[in-house]
């Protein structure tokens, strides 16, 4: 029988493509029966949290295991190191093209890789590669972002089911119109609000929602501590998954493309460190809640490829996350009622 441990919150910070560190750790928590009353999410943590809490047409465990399937088969990624399954082309014609593709008989069997063998996943990725290559685009020098706002979440989350959950859920986005952080609550969160929360500059144009423009919240508050502090003053235990403040993500670039990834992640790693430190000093030390941080340790040999969208990297990080989650529970399980 679970001991009474009070009100618990899980904080899922930004992180991509190393988000499978968090899905792996969450699987360890799910298997151990750990439940939370509150979920506070930012950036890639929103992908992890929403797909876990309200998975579309699969169980929570299946959804967590399926997270690795949004990477690209290595045989393709080694030749074309872009995740065309996550980042899709912008424009009205591209939108119509995606809609037409989704109406093809057997479409879901091609894109849903849960339960596929490695060979089947390669064939799926190969078909999706040509779909992406043939997709029209209106990208130009006058575009405000490279990609259409996140489409992949449609395959992952049942937003109607999300609204029926008992847990309190918070997702952040930064409002450019008001120049302040916006906190979306469970009843508000739908496809549009999610896309607003993940609109990282350059990759995506600012997302217009109810006449206001938004960018990714994790670009300003890597963990959505603001949503937690403003709405949940009576927490007993706060667990933070820190997949962004990892110094091992920084390394000597392997090539110009890798250098591009490094210039994006470098300020985000610093932001993750600063946000967590600030939360400890300004909020946590003044209350009685127990703050537990799961720091992911990526082995040195895996660090150079830790920001790759290859299937092998996502699988490796998932395994690291799972082992990290198990180790965390061995040390802190009693504080979480397991």
Question: Which sequence ranges carry the predicted segments?
Answer:
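Patatin-like phospholipase
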Residues: 7-9, 16-141, 145-149, 185-196, ...
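Structural motif
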Residues: 8-9, 38, 213, 237-239
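Conserved small-residue
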Residues: 15, 25, 45, 171, ...
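Active-site gating loop/helix substructures
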Residues: 128-233
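C-terminal helical/tail subdomains of lipid-metabolizing enzymes
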Residues: 148, 276-338
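Glycine-rich beta-alpha junction loops
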Residues: 171-178, 221, 242-247, 296-302
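A short, conserved beta-to-alpha structural element at the edge of catalytic cores
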Residues: 235-254, 268-269
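Acidic, Ser/Thr-rich peripheral helices and adjacent loops at domain boundaries
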Residues: 252-277
């Amino acid at each position: 029988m679970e001991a009474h441990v009070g009100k618990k919150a899980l904080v899922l910070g930004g992180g991509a493509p190393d988000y499978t560190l968090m899905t792996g750790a969450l699987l360890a928590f799910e298997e151990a029966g750990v439940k939370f009353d509150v979920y506070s999410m930012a950036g890639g943590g929103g992908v992890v949290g929403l797909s876990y809490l309200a998975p579309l047409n699969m169980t929570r465990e299946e959804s967590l295991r399926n997270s690795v399937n949004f990477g690209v088969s290595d045989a393709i990624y080694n030749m074309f190191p872009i995740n065309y399954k996550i980042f899709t082309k912008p424009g009205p014609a591209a939108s119509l093209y995606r809609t037409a593709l989704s109406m093809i008989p057997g479409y879901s069997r091609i894109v849903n890789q849960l339960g596929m063998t490695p060979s089947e996943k390669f064939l799926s990725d190969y078909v999706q590669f040509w779909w992406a290559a043939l997709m029209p685009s209106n990208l130009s020098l006058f575009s405000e972002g490279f990609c259409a706002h996140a489409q992949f979440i449609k395959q992952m989350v049942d937003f109607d089911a999300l609204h029926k959950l008992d847990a309190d859920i918070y997702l952040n986005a930064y409002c450019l119109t008001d120049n302040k952080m916006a906190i979306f609550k469970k009843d508000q969160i739908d496809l549009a609000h999610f896309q607003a929360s993940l609109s990282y500059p350059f990759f995506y144009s600012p997302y217009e929602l109810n006449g206001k423009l938004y960018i990714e919240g994790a670009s300003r508050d890597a963990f959505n501590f603001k949503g937690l502090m403003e709405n949940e003053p009576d927490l007993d235990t706060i667990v933070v998954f820190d997949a962004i403040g990892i110094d091992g993500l920084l390394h000597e670039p392997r090539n110009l493309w890798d250098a591009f990834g490094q210039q994006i992640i470098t300020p985000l790693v610093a932001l993750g460190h600063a946000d967590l430190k600030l939360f400890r000093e300004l909020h946590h030390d003044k209350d009685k809640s127990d703050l537990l941080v799961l720091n992911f340790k990526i082995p040195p040999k895996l660090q150079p490829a830790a920001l790759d969208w290859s299937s092998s990297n996502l699988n490796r990080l998932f395994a690291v996350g799972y082992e990290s989650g198990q180790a965390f529970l061995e040390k802190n399980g009693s504080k979480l009622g397991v």
